[in-house]
Amino acid sequence: MTACGGDSDDPDDGGGSSSSSLAVTTPTVSNITSTSAVVEATATGSGMTSRGFCYSTSANPTISDTKVAGAAAQMTVTLTGLAAATTYHVRAYAQSSSEVKYSSDVTFTTSASSTDDSEEEQTVGPEALNRVSVHDPSVVWDPSTSNYYIFGSHRAAARSTNMMTWVSFTAPWATASSTNAGNAQAFTTPQVTKVKKGGADVDFNFNAFAWSKRGNNAYNIDKNMWAPDVIFNKKMQKWCMYLSINGDNWYSSIIMLTADKITGPYRYQASVVISGFQSGTSYKDTDLEIVIGSQASLPGRYNVGKGWGNRYPNCIDPCVFYDEQGKLWMSYGSWSGGIWMLELDEETGLRDYDVEYKLTGSGDGITIDPYFGKKIAGGYYVSGEASYIEYIGGYYYLFMTYGGLAAGGNPADYNNGGYQMRVFRSQNPDGPYVDSKNQNAMFNSYLLNFGPKENDGNRGVNIFGAYTKWGNLLTGGGYEASGERSQGHNSIIAADDGRTYLVYHTRFQNWGEGHQVRVHQVFQNEAGWLVAAPFEYTGETVKSSQIAKKQKVASDKIPGKYKLLIHDYKLDHTKKACAEPTEITLQANGTITGSQYSGTWSVKEGTSYITINIGQEYKGVMIEQTLEELNNKEKKLSDFTRTPCFTALRSETGVTIWGYKYSD
């Protein structure tokens, strides 16, 4: 196998000469996994037409093979799609019209790792579960500590080595004079007061606390630090926290803080994007003029007063990610004018002020704005928040949560409840994003997109929603036994251990507004759509790559009685409605019988793909899971019930189903 990161089709080896003006440094390789590695080098010189990296399983790769560009003189590229336990050769190169200059050959070996298809023995189960409450959990892996971390609103955070045993902590704030600053002091004075535009330094000093206070004289910062997202910036070699400083009347901003350790302390660097300059001269206190140029007055498209929410975003709920070419992006927004996307500058972690966005559309139908970037979902004050984007198995998946975040049960307030995760996907990081019915994530007018009155065509795959009476856990007493509802504001991680984890907060049927974090494994079905395991993750060993290659549940173990749960749209959250299971039997001859549903089932040979047809065809996966019970701590792994389970999606409707085998 040979490949090359670059952007020229010239096959000439060149070789360079002693008088060459081109120069390349020897690559450094880091963040090596079983399928990827990060390479860095510098390529400079006059007359350069392209630069990049060549890599191969053979020595001294050249540019005569597949190429992907290295963008800047200081190049950082993530090599993906590598084979596990394989030695690769990599060279940096620079090319002009007359020559190609190569660096020395460097080798690295991908890990044999747990992302291969080897079988693992499950060593822990539900006894390892330790619950935490983190609202709006955003998950990230820190290889230096071998921990997963989740960061949420109001400074809630937790860590775990296994996605089950969570330990809470608080990351401190830093200022110039303190490593444990208070909330009211932490966001007033940015460390960065000049930003780059057109190669020049431009003054910008933004007081995030003062901006959000404009929306309400009684403003309390303690209640308005929302939904952070944390990522390690490879260029900066810093942990970067993107934090929403929310304010009333859209006076919000997303700011970036940095730390040397993932646990902090985090210091405020600068704002990334700001909302709420809907009238007067308030825009003078933002970076609007840095982005679009000097203005005699506020441009009319922003001068909309209380109409802001139909057109433009509330700048909260950031999701920051690297695409497969190494470019840094941020999606953001909540209800209001939808979800938007900006390109970030990896050198600074802030918005890339040199990327221009040409105004597209007019009025409330603006889809590209010179300041806010590109709209990818929502709009017209349709519900939707908590965008999260992750690249999984060839697609960028966009998660959003529709509806109101509360537990529901208030017929007089339709927006109280109905929180539900929806899924879209795209082959490009900035869209277009569509659901399994090919419906676009963007709206062209106001529609109601959640609850019993939903009239938007049931947009977005309903990966799962409120449910009760499910499994052993939900047959006893206590709030957990009452069932989950209002699940959402999730994150998702395609982890280095070969599993993909969906992390979300949930409320419960009989616990008011109390909430906890839950984690489910997620798989791709045969059509490449995501389906979630029916029970939370409790140490199961099945890996994402095994689904297409191995039958994880033997055919003779599948037949039997099953509980079937259908996650349909339009549950009446005002009445705290939940999906409840019914009973079916998967017969050994491939038929399904039951009082409500009958049909057929089949497993694709040599895989874990299952097809369930109960009048409508669902495509999913069949795995084995461990059923939780209420008294987990008093048991060991061998005491728990392991049973065949399926999770499947009907692409034509976006409805998902779950099932598990049970004994009377």
Language model features: what each stretch is:
Residues 112-664:
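Carbohydrate-active catalytic/glycan-binding domains of CAZyme proteins
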Residues 8-114:
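Short, surface-exposed linear motifs at loops/turns and structural transition points
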Residues 2-3:
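C-terminal motif of bacterial Sec signal peptides marking the signal peptidase cleavage site
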